[in-house]
Regions:
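Membrane topogenic/interface segments and analogous intrinsically disordered interaction regions
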Residues: 1-196
């Protein structure tokens, strides 16, 4: 499954390679580790939820259920976005940089690590609205502060888009726009759950 973005590009003279003698084993181990992290994320969140649940009030328990459901959902939406959208864009960008006289043969271990890193980062970035909700309920952040910081957030998202995506304006915007939408969703959630 993780090789599908490369297969879809239908590259000529392309093959992944294992340079070190331990690379085949390490590739499978890293795939297993990252796959386990992605699949176990709901369980990790559930364990945190179970630890906190007995010590809070009934109203807070309702918030906690809401946070749990949305946290898991947003994580998987982020992972899907990273895998189906951002990973193919970044691979096609790197492939475009290759000279015709060069055979594109990246190390399999490097490709697997890069792919899973990108997918996990997207999943974690999609936790922004949940983080806004938690920090609002803990009275660390408030709706007004998030609203005031909107212009700074836009700049930060554009910079992150430039760093994490290929250096063309379209890819930068394709990463920055979802981040901005998540930020606005965080502001909206913070507004709904603000202290009245």
């Amino acid at each position: 499954i993780i090789m599908q973005p490369i297969i879809d590009l239908d590259l000529k003279n392309f093959q992944l390679q294992d340079i070190k003698i331990t690379s085949p084993f390490m590739a499978k181990a890293i795939m297993a580790l990252f796959s386990a992290l992605i699949v176990c994320f709901p369980y990790i969140i559930f364990e945190i939820y179970s630890f906190i649940y007995p010590a809070i009030s009934k109203i807070s328990k309702i918030y906690l259920v809401f946070i749990f459901i949305f946290s898991v959902s947003f994580f998987f939406v982020g992972c899907i976005f990273g895998y189906s959208f951002l990973l193919p864009i970044s691979i096609s960008f790197f492939v475009r940089l290759i000279d015709d006289s060069v055979i594109f043969a990246p190390e399999r271990l490097n490709y697997i690590f890069y792919s899973f890193w990108l997918i996990l980062v997207c999943g974690l970035i999609y936790q922004l609205p949940i983080i806004s909700l938690i920090l609002t309920k803990l009275k660390i952040l408030n709706y007004e502060f998030l609203k005031q910081m909107r212009s700074y957030a836009i700049v930060i998202f554009l910079v992150l888009g430039a760093i994490l995506s290929p250096p063309d304006p379209l890819s930068q915007l394709l990463l920055a726009i979802p981040l901005y939408v998540l930020y606005e969703l965080g502001i909206f959630i913070s507004y709904i759950f603000r202290e009245k």
